[in-house]
């Protein structure tokens, strides 16, 4: 009997051990119960930290690439103005390159833009000449406002150099263009009855640091003369 029980007990023990081994394979390792040592375990922790940091860096880099920086309103307007000027040069007869552009071509471009203006500029024969608020409509032409032209030239002057142009050959910075803008400003100021003079800002007065309500403190009295005993 005892010899028959031993194989049965051995078989049961083998079955139990096999089930335990299978459970150990299916169950995830519990890292909390076995803290990392200074050798291999510490290295594993470092790899995990490096992996998380690299993953965070890649995700942040991916997020930055997915959301490109939107150009400012000034930069977007400058790009549109430069494209418009480039189209004007291509449609010119004969077509002009950027290196061939001069101040005369800039003046032609500014006069060309007048047909798209929205500012009423009264002629000398108009009864509303010099009237800032005309009470009735008139057949005077629409022109580009001086402020719009001045800002346009400033943007194109910067765009010319940003696109490879040399500052000494910038056609938007020549004297003829500056004189034209001055004439437009003076003529529109007279015709529209407005003033384009910049208001002078008042200089801030220095703050009173005396602390006496605006009245300076009197100087301290002189020290008393030394006594006769002290002199001896």
UniProtKB/Swiss-Prot annotation:
GO terms for cellular component: nucleus. It comes from the Eukaryota. It is found in: Nucleus. The keyword Transcription applies. Residues 38-53 have a biased composition (Gly residues). Pfam families: ALOG_dom. The keyword Signal does not apply. Keywords: Developmental protein, DNA-binding, Nucleus, Transcription, Transcription regulation. Its main location: nucleus. PROSITE patterns: ALOG. InterPro entries: ALOG (IPR040222), ALOG_dom (IPR006936). Residues 20-77, 189-232 are annotated as: Disordered. Residues 216-232 have a biased composition (Pro residues). One of its GO terms (molecular function) is DNA binding. Belongs to the plant homeotic and developmental regulators ALOG protein family. Probable transcription regulator that acts as a developmental regulator by promoting cell growth in response to light. This is Protein G1-like3. It comes from Oryza sativa subsp. indica (Rice).
């Amino acid at each position: 009997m005892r010899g028959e029980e031993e194989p049965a007990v051995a078989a049961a023990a083998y079955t139990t051990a096999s089930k335990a081994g299978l459970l150990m394979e299916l169950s995830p390792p519990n890292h909390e119960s076995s803290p990392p040592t200074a050798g291999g375990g510490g290295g594993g922790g470092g790899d995990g930290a490096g992996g998380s940091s690299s993953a965070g860096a890649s995700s942040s880099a991916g997020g930055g690439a997915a959301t490109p920086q939107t150009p400012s309103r000034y930069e977007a307007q400058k790009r549109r103005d430069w494209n418009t000027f480039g189209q004007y040069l291509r449609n010119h007869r004969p077509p002009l390159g950027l290196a061939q552009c001069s101040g005369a071509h800039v003046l032609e471009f500014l006069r060309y833009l007048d047909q798209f203006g929205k500012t009423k500029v009264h002629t000398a024969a108009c009864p509303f000449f010099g009237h800032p608020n005309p009470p009735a409509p008139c057949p005077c032409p629409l022109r580009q406002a001086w402020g719009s032209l001045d800002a346009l030239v400033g943007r194109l002057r910067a765009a010319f150099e940003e696109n490879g142009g040399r500052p000494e050959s910038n056609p938007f910075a020549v004297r003829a263009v500056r004189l034209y803008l001055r004439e437009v400003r003076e003529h529109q100021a007279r015709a529209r009855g407005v003033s384009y003079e910049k208001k002078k800002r008042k200089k801030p007065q220095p703050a009173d640091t005396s602390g006496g309500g605006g009245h300076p403190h009197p100087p301290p009295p002189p020290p008393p003369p030394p006594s006769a005993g002290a002199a001896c």
